[in-house]
A protein has these predicted regions:
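Cytosolic juxtamembrane regulatory segments of multi-pass membrane proteins
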Residues: 47, 198-199
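Auxiliary, metal-adjacent structural segments of Zn-dependent hydrolase domains
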Residues: 1-29, 34-41
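Small-residue-rich helix-interface/hinge motifs
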Residues: 36-86
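Metalloprotease/metallohydrolase-associated module, dominated by Zn2+-dependent proteases
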Residues: 2-19, 74-197
Length: 199
């Protein structure tokens, strides 16, 4: 995970959404680092549990796994699943990302969540994190490094891997842009904003 990707694909959309919302800055600014920490602690687990669950469901042999970084040992971004694999076990985290994006868009557009902390968590974990996850891993593949999309390419072909990577990336990207456009005065209407104002 790179700092620049996290800043551009995760934190920046969150800040923009909050700024366009009906909430005053004092209601959400202190929540941003809390949301980031919760995301950071859950990111590797959600990614690796998808690999592991797919391997177990398909009866693949699992040799070793680590679902979260060992923070107490100073590890900041280590997680892995070593197992027999196929196309589904390799792609499962990104299938999860696509599903999460659809769920996130539905929750936010229907205004099911109206509290800034829960809204921020839903946006970050369900929409912005999938954007980061797919973009980060696909771009690593494009630079010829070994990762999930490289394994998927070896199992299929380079053309198929690029098609899947771009197609999967498009969904959380479009979801993010759509929600940022819909963020104006969220979750309340213009009249509430005019009545109470923003500071």
């Amino acid at each position: 995970m790179t700092t620049l990707e996290i800043a551009l694909l995760l934190m920046l959309p969150l800040v923009i959404f909050f700024q366009r919302s009906s909430w005053k800055m004092k209601e959400y600014v202190f929540l941003i680092p809390i949301i980031y920490v919760i995301w950071y602690l859950s990111y590797a687990f959600l990614h690796e549990i998808c690999h592991l669950s797919a391997a177990l469901m398909l009866g693949k042999k699992v040799y070793d796994f680590q679902l979260i970084p060992y923070f107490w040992k100073g590890e900041l971004g280590v997680g892995y699943v070593k197992s027999e694999y196929n196309q589904l076990t390799v792609l499962m985290p990104y299938i999860k990302d696509v599903v999460f994006s659809v769920i996130g868009v539905s929750l936010i557009t229907k205004k099911v969540i109206k509290k800034p902390l829960l809204t921020g968590l839903a946006l970050t974990i369900l929409v912005f994190s999938p954007l980061f996850d797919i973009a980060n891993n696909y771009l690593v593949y494009v630079t010829q490094a070994i990762n999930d999309f490289r394994a998927f390419s070896d199992l299929t072909s380079s053309a198929v891997a690029h098609f899947v990577g771009i197609s999967f990336l498009a969904i959380p990207l479009i979801s993010t842009l759509f929600l940022l456009m819909k963020a104006k005065n969220y979750p309340f209407g213009i009249y509430i904003k005019e009545k109470y104002g923003k500071q």
